[in-house]
From Swiss-Prot:
Pfam families registered for this protein in UniProt: DUF72
Organism: Bacillus subtilis (strain 168)
Domain of life where this protein originates: Bacteria
Family in the record: Belongs to the UPF0759 family.
Stated name of the protein: UPF0759 protein YunF
Annotated InterPro entries: DUF72, UPF0759_sf
């Protein structure tokens, strides 16, 4: 099965009924898509009340891709707010309890930063991370091209498969070492993740000193031909694993939801079990 969704649920104005309150947006979102990426967990390990609330607000078959906390992936500047890395991982795993108990956890996404390159100590850290996470399904996304350079390409994929990492396949601007190529290879027989980041080369490189780079980094709208090409790629990936989870992250200009809907039409997919959709009668 191919599951289409977006990163976050709070900034997709084209899918909400008029005047939808922020606390009602997840419910509205889940009437359109069966999966979502939770990125609040990247900035802080979420308290139980938040996770329980989000689980309760979504349909029984809804699935979350929970982004790993930034201290776990090396994005955090300075000291982590825990006594040890083990304590940090334990706290994060406890936060996943509502998703695990409700069968709503698709996977945890470990997205590593551009400076996390292919070298022995980083390979060892990936192995350690996966050991800490135990049987929890985890996806791995790189932002450094060295992992897929000719000397390491097959070794990286073999390592991911041997260690039980789900491959997070990326569509993103192809610029230097801070981006990775699109590698259409599943490393887990059950799940593959695909994330669409757009192809805005200028935005990806932090123009103008990087002051407002987050506002333009994902400013991109995929055209019909690009989506049709990806229809073929997604079908190819589905031949390699049971389920493919697709996330549109190109939302600096509000394009993610529309592109997600276009992909649903191209694939001729209609999901059952979505939340009831509110009718706009006037």
């Amino acid at each position: 099965m191919i599951y289409i969704g977006l990163t976050g649920w709070g900034d997709h104005d084209s899918i909400y009924p008029p005047k939808t309150a922020s606390q009602k947006k997840l419910q509205a979102y889940s009437s359109h898509f069966p999966i979502v990426e939770l990125d609040a967990s990247f900035y802080a390990i979420q308290p139980a009340r938040n996770n329980e609330k989000w689980v309760k607000e979504t349909p029984e078959t809804f699935q979350f891709i929970v982004k790993a906390y930034q201290g776990m992936t090396g994005h955090q500047r300075g000291e982590i707010p825990f006594d040890s890395k083990e304590e940090m991982f334990d706290a994060f795993k406890v936060s996943l309890t509502p998703y695990l108990h409700s069968n709503k956890l698709a996977m945890v996404l470990f997205q590593f930063p551009p400076w996390f390159d292919c070298k022995k100590e980083n390979v060892a850290y990936l192995r350690w991370c996966k050991h800490q996470m135990g049987d929890i399904p985890c996806a791995l996304e790189f932002r450094n091209r060295s992992w897929f350079s000719p000397p390491f390409y097959e070794q990286t994929l073999s390592f991911m498969k041997a260690e039980g990492w789900i491959h997070s396949v990326c569509d993103e601007p192809q610029i230097g070492e801070g981006s990775v190529p699109t590698v259409l290879r599943a490393t887990d027989e059950n799940k593959t993740l695909v994330r669409f980041h757009g192809r805005n080369k200028q935005g990806w490189m932090k123009p103008d000193g990087g002051k407002n780079w987050r506002e333009v980094r994902y400013l991109y709208r995929y055209n019909q031909q690009e989506l049709e090409d990806w229809k073929k790629h997604l079908n190819e990936l589905q031949q390699q694993c049971k389920d493919v989870f697709v996330l549109f992250n190109n939302n600096s200009g509000g394009d993610a939801a529309d592109n997600g809907k276009q992909m649903l039409e191209l694939l001729d997919i209609e999901y059952s079990g979505l939340a009831p959709r509110q009718l706009d009668l006037f």
